[in-house]
């Protein structure tokens, strides 16, 4: 049975500044975590969920990612690429440029530099607003969080018994979240905050394992968790 979101996007254009000098010669999505590199964990999970096509945006050392992944056949996917000038578009601009390659609405987006044990079929079958975010407990490096979750509503400010949480980098978006923005550099965070202000953003809390692999310490932690997960299978 086809999955509810047949098209997905993986964000893989970042420079990985905090992991230099490693990322001077290796793009962050190709860093190994366990038996696969970061981006391959996503590709395998997307294929298992029933995704047909994945768009990957590329900039820094993007040719290495494209050479490694190819057309996606070995993952059971069709993979296409959206090439960007390095540092030119930001996350929102990268998604905006790639919309021409994404013909389904809504669609799933995953940051290429996170590691998680999320089962993608736990995402909702449909969304009512412009976006839906997967939120996690606030890590040490982001103690104040990004948003507040009140029921299934994502808010910018606390209300009642709402909970402060961190955006995981995994979301479901409608095209109209981006369509009204001019082409070029666009902050995804700003678009999401605008959607939250307009009561157009829903979310869910994910209590499982999740790491933003942005520093050497977090990379080591992700590798430890991956080893532990393999032993527990």
Name every feature range the model reports, one short phrase each:
Residues 5-22:
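A phosphate-binding catalytic loop at a beta-strand-loop-alpha-helix junction
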Residues 19, 65-69, 222:
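Hydrophobic packing residues within well-ordered alpha-helices of enzyme cores
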Residues 24-28:
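Short alpha-helical oligomerization interface
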Residues 29, 78-80, 130, 200-202:
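Conserved beta-strand segments of alpha/beta enzyme cores
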Residues 132-146:
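Short beta-strand-to-loop element that shapes/binds the nucleotide-sugar donor at the catalytic cleft/hinge
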């Amino acid at each position: 049975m086809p999955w509810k979101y047949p098209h997905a996007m993986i964000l893989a254009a970042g420079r990985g500044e905090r992991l230099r000098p490693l990322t001077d010669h290796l793009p962050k999505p190709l860093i190994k975590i366990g038996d696969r590199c970061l981006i391959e964990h996503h590709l395998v999970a997307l294929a298992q969920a029933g995704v047909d096509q994945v768009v990957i945006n590329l900039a820094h050392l993007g040719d290495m990612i494209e050479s490694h992944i190819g057309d996606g056949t070995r993952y059971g996917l069709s993979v296409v690429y959206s090439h960007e000038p390095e540092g030119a578009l930001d996350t929102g601009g990268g998604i905006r440029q790639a919309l021409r390659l994404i013909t389904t609405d809504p669609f799933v987006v995953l940051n290429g530099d996170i590691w998680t044990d999320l089962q993608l079929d736990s995402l909702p079958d449909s969304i009512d607003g412009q976006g839906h975010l997967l939120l996690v407990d606030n890590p040490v490096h982001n103690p104040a969080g990004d948003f507040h979750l009140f029921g299934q509503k994502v808010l910018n400010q606390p209300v009642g018994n709402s909970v402060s949480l961190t955006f995981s980098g995994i979301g479901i978006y409608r095209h109209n979240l981006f369509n009204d923005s001019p082409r070029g550099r666009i902050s995804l965070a700003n678009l999401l905050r605008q959607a939250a202000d307009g009561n157009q953003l829903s979310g869910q809390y994910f209590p499982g394992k999740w790491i933003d692999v942005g520093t050497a310490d977090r990379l080591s932690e992700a590798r430890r968790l991956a080893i532990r997960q393999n032993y527990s299978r």
